[in-house]
Design a protein with these regions (language model features):
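Catalytic-core regions of core metabolic enzymes
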Residues: 1-448
Length: 448
């Protein structure tokens, strides 16, 4: 970090170890304007086992690793090619301000290919602005369909001035990076001189506009090293392979470490499981709003149901996943209904809760003490959809309310509790209050 030649740092991580040292590293790097990007292994059980077997690393959960890297402001990539391509972007251009991209190619096939490959990413191709369309029309004429991604055909190939005007027309401040898709032939079996025009046009465009430009080959082997060196010397990012280029562009977004200090987990004590009723009472004291509940034998609860008239939820006790064993009965409105439901459950004691009518969504909120990474808050789709959708997001404690809200909005389920298709929206503030209260409870009981 103290070497003035260093512009970005790539890391291969098996385990983290000293968490405060990682936090100090990330903060110093951010202060110096040196972005960090990591290839963190350990997504699979096999990789975690391999890590433990040949190093002293504590593997921890992958969700915890993701949360820690996010907390540190370190980008995470999945493979070596993407790591290298990300470092190229960071070295030449620095972190990108957004995921808005443009693409220019002389083939409709390449334009379609990059559009499809970007479909499942967070990157977007903004529609052309009026200014872009005016400039492109002047440079390309009426025969070219103007769009982003752009297929500029080959009408102007070999005309460096015209190609430069067309490329420059796509460069606008709203675009974080512009891709020029070019495949170079092998110099030992082909004459590459006909590609000189596109290299020079790209360099001239960069000099004229100052825009962030990457020349991308469809396959890694189609970007010769001598061309890459020449492009980089001219301020253009040479990239091998469209998929790796897109993944690298996602990873190269502007990031910053969290201002909150990491919580280093203490040595774990023997775990003690408390009952659902006791857990809810403890959380209620911490500020979490919970349904009114009673515990007791079936007849006592049935008599209560006759007086209060519900609707109620009846639950058996002693089983974690109650729905899988028929341990939950919903929408009970009388004592007889409670008796009939309880008779089908193998339990001596029960929980009777008031039932929330017409919920917008069920949300799972969990906290795990991950010895390798810290205390991990997971928020996601709950109830029936918890394991079916696997729609969750995890962050490290302590987390600010704004960070928690951003995490909620990363969920697919967020469309529902924001009011999907004119359906009633959920109370986001109440949900955030609950998450903050649960976080406060954990912070008050870190060593228990």
């Amino acid at each position: 970090l103290d070497d003035p030649r260093v512009t970005a740092i790539g890391l291969h991580i098996e385990g983290f170890g000293d968490l405060p040292a990682w936090q100090a590293l990330s903060r110093k790097a951010h202060t110096k304007g040196i972005p960090l990007v990591a290839l963190k292994v350990g997504k699979s059980i096999e990789a975690r086992n391999a890590t433990i077997s040949h190093t002293a690393s504590l593997a921890g959960s992958d969700a915890g690793a993701n949360a820690l890297l996010e907390h540190l402001g370190i980008a995470r990539v999945d493979d070596l090619p993407t790591l290298l391509e990300t470092l190229k972007i960071l070295h030449v251009a620095g972190p990108l301000p957004s995921g808005q991209i443009a693409s220019i190619s002389c083939s409709g096939g390449e334009a379609s290919l990059i559009a499809d490959m970007a479909h499942d990413t967070t990157l977007t191709f903004p529609p052309l602005t009026d200014l872009q369309e005016t400039r492109l029309l002047a440079a390309l004429g009426p025969k070219v369909a103007l769009a982003n991604p752009l297929d500029y055909h080959t009408y102007i190939w070999r005309d460096v001035a015209a190609m430069t005007r067309a490329f420059s027309a796509m460069i606008v401040p709203e675009i974080a990076i512009t891709f020029l898709i070019v495949d170079f032939p092998r110099g030992d079996i082909c004459d590459p001189s006909d590609w000189e025009c596109v290299i020079q046009s790209a360099l001239d465009t960069r000099a004229a506009t100052g825009g962030t430009i990457a020349m991308v080959s469809t396959l890694p082997e189609l970007m010769p090293e001598h061309v890459a060196r020449r492009l980089m010397a001219g301020g253009i990012i040479p990239m091998g392979g469209i998929r790796a280029a897109l993944a690298a562009t996602e990873a190269a977004h502007l990031r910053a470490p969290s201002p909150a200090d990491l919580i280093v987990p203490s040595k774990s004590m023997p775990a003690e499981t408390i009952s659902e009723a006791d857990a809810k009472r403890a959380l209620q004291k911490a500020g979490v709003t919970v349904p009114k509940l009673l515990t007791g034998d079936l007849e006592t609860l049935a008599k209560h149901a006759d007086i209060q008239h519900g609707p109620f939820v009846l639950k058996s006790t002693g089983v974690a996943h109650k729905s899988e064993v028929g341990g939950v009965a919903l929408s009970l409105t009388s004592g007889d209904a409670v008796r009939q439901a309880g008779a089908k459950m193998s339990s001596a004691t029960f929980i009777l809760e008031e039932m929330i009518a017409d919920p917008v969504a069920e949300i799972l909120i969990g906290v795990v003490k991950d010895p390798a990474h810290g205390f991990v808050i997971t928020i996601g789709a709950g109830g029936l959809f918890a394991e079916l959708l696997k729609d969750t997001a995890s962050i490290l404690m302590p987390a600010s309310r704004d960070h928690l809200k951003q995490t909620l909005n990363r969920l697919k389920l967020s469309k529902i509790f924001n009011g999907y298709r004119n359906q009633p929206a959920g109370n986001i503030d109440a949900l955030l209050d609950a998450v903050e209260a649960i976080q406060s409870y954990v912070l008050a009981n870190l060593d228990t």
